[in-house]
C-alpha cells in the first residue's frame, strides 16, 4: 500500500515523466504482398515499409496529438474513484536514452500534481491522431515521498473515438483484489469488464475483447461440400478447447459455421503488427499458403519438375544441388525476408533448402534401428513411448463397436537377447510406441482416399547397455468384414539384408508416418497451442494486470500466441490447408485431434505425472526429483525434469510472496472466477471431469501455474524446434504414405526387390507435398531475433516488488546452471541416446538460443 503522504507534496509540484512508444511503421502482411491470380505484386526487398504519409516522423506526436492524465492511488473523488489529473500532452522528443530499443522513441512530459492528488497509481491516455501507436511505458521520476513509479504498458493505442471507455494503464505494483487501494478498485473492475466485452457483435481489429467460441471456422462450405468440416467444441462427439471469439458472419450453407476472413480478429495486443521479428516468422506461414504453394503448383503443372524422387540422392539434392524451377515461378515467391532466407535461389533458377541437422554428419545414419528408437526418446516427439506392462498389448477401443483389438504379435518372434517375456516385463525393459487406437477409427476413411496407411504398434527392448532397440512392428488395418470384426495385421521383424530389410525399412516408415501426424496434430497443435488458448482468454478476462498471477503468467502468453493460432486456423489446419495437403489424415486431421482431446487430462500435463502415467518412471524418494526413470538415458525426460523443477521452484517462491495461507487463495475473487471460467468455458467440454484441481490450496495453485508455464514454454520447445532438424529430411520423417506393403507376385513387389530406394520413395511423401512440408517446418523451427527466453523478461521493471525480482533472478541463475549441466551430459559418451548415430546432441531443452534454426532454446511463450 502507498504511505500516508498528506501534506508532504507541495502545491503545484510538477512530476517529470518519460513516455516510450513505437510508431506504426510497418505495413500489414496483406499490404506488403497483394495476392492476385496466384502471383505476388508490390514486392519490397526488406519486408518493411515506413508509413511516411500517415506519420510525419516523430513530430506528429507533439502539439495536442497525445494526452495523458494521472490517476491517484491514494485520493478518491466523490464517487470513490481515484482523482484524475489534468490533460497533459507529450512534449519534446528525447534524442537518446540508453534503455531504448530498436524503433522506440521517447518523449518528455510534465504533469501538474499536488498533495490533494496523492500518489499516482494509474493513468489515462488519449490518442487524437488517425493512426495507432504502440505504447511501451511511462516512467514518473522523483515523485515526492515515493521516488520512481513505472508503468509497463505494451499496448496499441488507437484514436480515442474508437473506444467506449478511456484507455487506462496501471503502475507495475501487484495487488490481490482485497489489497487494491480503494481509489483503484473501480478502475480495476472496469478495465476487466472492458476486456470481457458483452459477447455480441463482430469484433473489430482495434478491439481488445477476449471471449470464447468453438472451432467453427476451419471449413468453407460455401465453396463446396468437400470443404465443409465438423464443428469442434460444444459437443460430446467433437469436444475441443475453445478459441478466441471473432463474431464473424455465418456461412450461407451452414449457419453454425463462420465465414473465413482475410484477416482474422485477435485482441489487438496479441498481435504486435510486425514490430517484432517473430511476427515475420508467423506471417511467413501465411506466405507459404498464399504465395509459395501456388508457385510450386505452377511448376508441377508445367511439368518443369517431376513429382517423384527417384533416389535418396534426389531428396538430398534439395539441400545440395537444389531443384530447378521456372524463372517466372521463382519471381512469385514471397518477398518476406524469412521466406527469402528459406528459399535460397542466389538469383538463379535453382531452389535450395537448408541442410537439416539429421544428415549434416552422416547421410545414412537415419536408417539405423538405433536412430529409429533413439528419436522416440530424443526426437521431436519424445512424449509418446510407454513402458509395456502386459503382453500382448491390449486396446482401449470399445469392443462393442470395434471388436477385439488385442495385438497379434507373438512372444515367439521377439528377440529379447535371451530374456523371457516375463523377465523383460518384470524388469521394465519392454516398451511400446502405440498408435493403433488413434488411427484405427479413421483408417478406413483415410484409405478410401489416395493415401494408404496402417495403424502401428512398435515393440522395443532395452538392451543391457542401456540403449533401446525395436524388436517388432505390427501393421494393422480395419477388418474387411466391418469394424465389429476387429482388425487384420502383419507383424514385421528387423532384418538387415535382402527384400526383408526393405520391408523392415518400409514398416519403420509406416510407424513414422503415424508418429509425424500424431506429433503435428496432437503433441504440437493440440497439446500446446490449442489447450493453452483458453488460459490466455480467461487470464485477460478475469485476472487484472495488477494481479500477481497475471504478472506471473503473462509472459508465457504474450508476443504472438493467439495470433499464431488464428494464422493456423487460416492457413495450416483449415480445410485444404497446409496440414491437410501434406499429412496423411487430410480432411480428417483436426477431427482426429478432437478424438484425442476426449482423453486429455490437465493434471497429466505435469511432466512427472506424464512420465508415471506412461510407465516411463516410478516414484522413488531416493532418486532425483522423487522419480526413477526406467530408461536412465532418456534425454527429454532427464532434461525436462531439470527444467520442470526449476519452473516449479520459481512458481513456489513467487506465489508464496502473495498468499500466506490457503484461505488467501480461496478468498481471491479474481483467481476463483479465473479458474471457474477456465474449467467451465475454456475447456467446457471436459468441465465435469473429476481430475480438475479445485484451486483451494497453495500446492494446487503452484501446480496449476507450473503446468501452464511448462506447456507454453518447455513442452512447446521440445515438440516444435526439432521439426526441421529431424523432419527436414523427408526420408527420416515422412508425413504420409501412398501405398500399402507390396504383396509378393505383384509388380510393386518386384520393384521393391530391384530397388529398395524407389520402393521407399513411391510409398512415402512425394515431392510436391515434401516441398510444402519443408517450407512450413523450417519456419516453425526458427527463433526470431527478439525472442524472449525462459528466465528472461522483456522489461526488467515488470514488477516493483523487489522480492519477486530477486526470486526471478534466482530462477534465471538456476536455468544457466542447468544449461551447463546439460551440455556436460551431451559430452558423456556413455549416454548414447543423447547424440546417437546421427551425431546430433539433444539440445532442445537448453534454455537459451541465438536467432535462427538452432535446435535449442526455450522461448517464454508459444511464439511460433
Swiss-Prot record:
UniProt cross-references to PANTHER family, sorted A to Z: LIPOXYGENASE
Organism: Pisum sativum
Stated name of the protein: Seed linoleate 9S-lipoxygenase-2
Catalytic activity: (9Z,12Z)-octadecadienoate + O2 = (9S)-hydroperoxy-(10E,12Z)-octadecadienoate
Lipoxygenase domain residues: 174-864
Positions bound to Fe cation: 524, 529, 716, 720, 864
Keywords (A to Z) from UniProt: Cytoplasm, Dioxygenase, Fatty acid biosynthesis, Fatty acid metabolism, Iron, Lipid biosynthesis, Lipid metabolism, Metal-binding, Oxidoreductase, Oxylipin biosynthesis
Entry's localization field: Cytoplasm
Record Pfam families: Lipoxygenase (PF00305), PLAT (PF01477)
Free-text comment on the cofactor: Binds 1 Fe cation per subunit.
Pathway: Lipid metabolism; oxylipin biosynthesis
Domain of life of the source: Eukaryota
Domain PLAT: 46-171
Family affiliation: Belongs to the lipoxygenase family.
Signal sequence segment: none
Biased composition (Basic and acidic residues): 251-264
Amino acid at each position: 500500500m502507498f504511505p500516508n503522504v498528506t501534506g508532504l507534496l507541495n502545491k503545484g509540484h510538477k512530476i517529470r515523466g518519460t513516455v516510450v512508444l513505437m510508431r506504426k511503421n510497418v505495413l500489414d502482411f496483406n499490404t506488403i504482398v497483394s495476392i492476385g491470380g496466384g502471383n505476388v505484386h508490390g514486392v519490397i526487398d526488406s519486408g518493411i515499409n515506413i508509413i511516411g504519409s500517415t506519420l510525419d516522423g516523430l513530430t506528429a506526436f507533439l502539439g495536442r496529438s497525445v494526452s495523458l492524465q494521472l490517476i491517484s492511488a491514494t485520493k478518491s473523488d466523490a464517487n470513490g474513484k481515484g482523482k484524475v489529473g489534468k490533460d497533459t500532452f507529450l512534449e519534446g522528443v528525447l534524442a537518446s536514452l540508453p534503455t531504448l530499443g530498436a524503433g522506440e522513441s521517447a518523449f518528455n512530459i510534465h504533469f501538474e500534481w499536488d498533495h490533494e492528488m496523492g500518489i499516482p497509481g494509474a493513468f489515462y491516455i488519449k490518442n487524437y491522431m488517425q493512426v495507432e501507436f504502440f505504447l511501451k511505458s511511462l516512467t514518473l521520476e522523483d515523485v515526492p515521498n515515493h521516488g520512481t513509479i513505472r508503468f509497463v504498458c505494451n499496448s496499441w493505442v488507437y484514436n480515442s473515438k474508437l473506444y467506449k471507455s478511456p484507455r487506462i494503464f496501471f503502475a507495475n505494483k501487484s495487488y490481490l483484489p482485497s489489497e487494491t487501494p480503494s481509489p483503484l478498485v473501480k478502475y480495476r473492475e472496469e478495465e476487466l469488464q472492458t476486456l470481457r466485452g458483452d459477447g455480441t457483435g463482430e469484433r473489430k481489429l482495434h478491439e481488445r475483447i477476449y471471449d470464447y467460441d468453438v472451432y467453427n471456422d476451419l471449413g468453407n462450405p460455401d465453396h463446396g461440400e468437400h470443404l465443409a468440416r465438423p464443428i469442434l467444441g460444444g459437443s460430446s462427439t467433437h469436444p475441443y478447447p475453445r478459441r478466441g471469439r471473432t463474431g464473424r458472419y455465418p456461412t450461407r450453407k451452414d449457419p453454425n459455421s463462420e465465414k473465413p476472413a482475410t484477416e482474422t480478429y485477435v485482441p489487438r495486443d496479441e498481435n504486435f503488427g510486425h514490430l517484432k521479428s517473430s511476427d515475420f516468422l508467423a506471417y511467413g506461414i501465411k506466405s507459404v499458403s498464399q504465395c509459395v504453394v501456388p508457385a510450386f503448383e505452377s511448376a508441377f503443372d508445367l511439368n518443369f519438375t517431376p513429382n517423384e524422387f527417384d533416389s535418396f540422392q534426389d531428396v538430398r539434392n534439395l539441400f545440395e544441388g537444389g531443384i530447378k524451377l521456372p524463372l517466372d515461378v521463382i519471381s512469385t515467391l514471397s518477398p518476406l525476408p524469412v521466406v527469402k532466407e528459406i528459399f535460397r535461389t542466389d538469383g538463379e533458377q535453382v531452389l535450395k533448402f537448408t541442410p537439416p541437422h539429421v544428415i549434416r554428419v552422416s547421410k545414412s545414419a537415419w536408417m539405423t534401428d538405433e536412430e529409429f528408437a533413439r528419436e522416440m526418446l530424443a526426437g521431436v516427439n519424445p512424449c509418446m513411448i510407454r513402458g509395456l506392462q502386459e503382453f500382448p498389448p491390449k486396446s482401449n477401443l470399445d469392443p462393442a463397436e470395434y471388436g477385439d483389438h488385442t495385438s497379434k504379435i507373438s512372444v515367439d518372434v521377439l528377440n529379447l537377447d535371451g530374456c523371457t517375456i516375463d523377465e523383460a516385463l518384470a524388469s521394465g525393459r519392454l516398451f511400446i510406441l502405440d498408435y493403433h487406437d488413434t488411427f484405427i477409427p479413421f483408417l478406413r476413411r483415410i484409405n478410401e482416399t489416395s493415401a494408404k496407411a496402417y495403424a502401428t504398434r512398435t515393440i522395443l527392448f532395452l538392451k543391457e547397455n542401456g540403449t533401446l532397440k525395436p524388436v517388432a512392428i505390427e501393421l494393422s488395418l480395419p477388418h474387411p468384414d466391418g469394424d465389429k470384426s476387429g482388425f487384420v495385421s502383419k507383424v514385421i521383424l528387423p532384418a538387415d539384408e535382402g527384400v526383408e530389410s526393405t520391408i523392415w525399412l518400409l514398416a519403420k516408415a509406416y510407424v513414422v508416418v503415424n508418429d509425424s501426424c500424431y506429433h503435428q496434430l496432437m503433441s504440437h497443435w493440440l497439446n500446446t497451442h490449442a489447450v493453452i488458448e483458453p488460459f490466455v482468454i480467461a487470464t485477460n478476462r478475469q485476472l487484472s494486470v495488477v494481479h500477481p498471477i497475471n504478472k506471473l503468467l503473462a509472459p508465457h502468453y504474450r508476443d504472438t500466441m493467439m495470433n499464431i493460432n488464428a494464422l493456423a486456423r487460416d492457413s495450416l489446419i483449415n480445410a485444404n490447408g497446409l496440414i491437410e495437403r501434406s499429412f496423411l489424415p487430410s480432411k480428417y486431421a483436426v477431427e482426429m485431434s478432437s478424438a484425442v482431446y476426449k482423453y486429455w487430462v490437465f493434471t497429466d500435463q505435469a511432466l512427472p505425472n506424464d512420465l508415471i502415467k506412461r510407465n516411463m518412471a516410478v516414484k522413488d524418494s531416493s532418486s532425483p526429483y522423487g522419480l526413477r526413470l526406467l530408461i536412465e538415458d532418456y534425454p527429454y525426460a532427464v532434461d525436462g525434469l531439470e527444467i520442470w523443477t526449476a519452473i516449479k521452484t520459481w512458481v513456489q517462491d513467487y506465489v508464496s510472496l502473495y498468499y500466506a495461507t490457503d484461505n488467501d487463495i480461496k478468498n481471491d475473487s479474481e483467481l476463483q472466477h479465473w479458474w471457474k471460467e477456465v474449467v467451465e468455458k475454456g475447456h467446457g467440454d471436459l468441465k465435469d471431469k473429476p481430475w480438475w484441481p479445485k484451486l483451494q490450496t497453495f500446492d494446487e495453485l503452484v501446480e496449476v501455474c507450473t503446468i501452464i508455464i511448462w506447456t507454453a514454454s518447455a513442452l512447446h520447445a521440445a515438440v516444435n524446434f526439432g521439426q526441421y532438424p529431424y523432419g527436414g529430411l523427408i526420408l527420416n520423417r515422412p508425413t504420409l504414405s501412398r501405398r500399402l506393403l507390396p504383396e509378393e507376385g505383384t509388380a510393386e513387389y518386384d520393384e521393391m526387390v530391384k530397388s529398395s530406394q524407389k520402393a521407399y520413395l513411391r510409398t512415402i511423401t512425394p515431392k510436391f507435398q515434401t516441398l510444402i512440408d519443408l517450407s512450413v517446418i523450417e519456419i516453425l523451427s526458427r527463433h526470431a531475433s527478439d525472442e524472449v527466453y525462459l528466465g528472461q523478461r522483456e522489461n526488467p521493471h515488470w514488477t516493483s516488488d523487489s522480492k519477486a525480482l530477486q526470486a526471478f533472478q534466482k530462477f534465471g541463475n538456476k536455468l544457466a546452471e542447468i544449461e551447463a549441466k546439460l551440455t556436460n551430459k551431451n559430452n558423456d559418451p556413455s549416454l548414447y541416446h543423447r547424440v546417437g548415430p546421427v551425431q546430433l546432441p539433444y539440445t532442445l531443452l537448453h534454455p537459451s538460443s541465438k536467432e535462427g534454426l538452432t535446435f535449442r532454446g526455450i522461448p517464454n511463450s508459444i511464439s511460433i
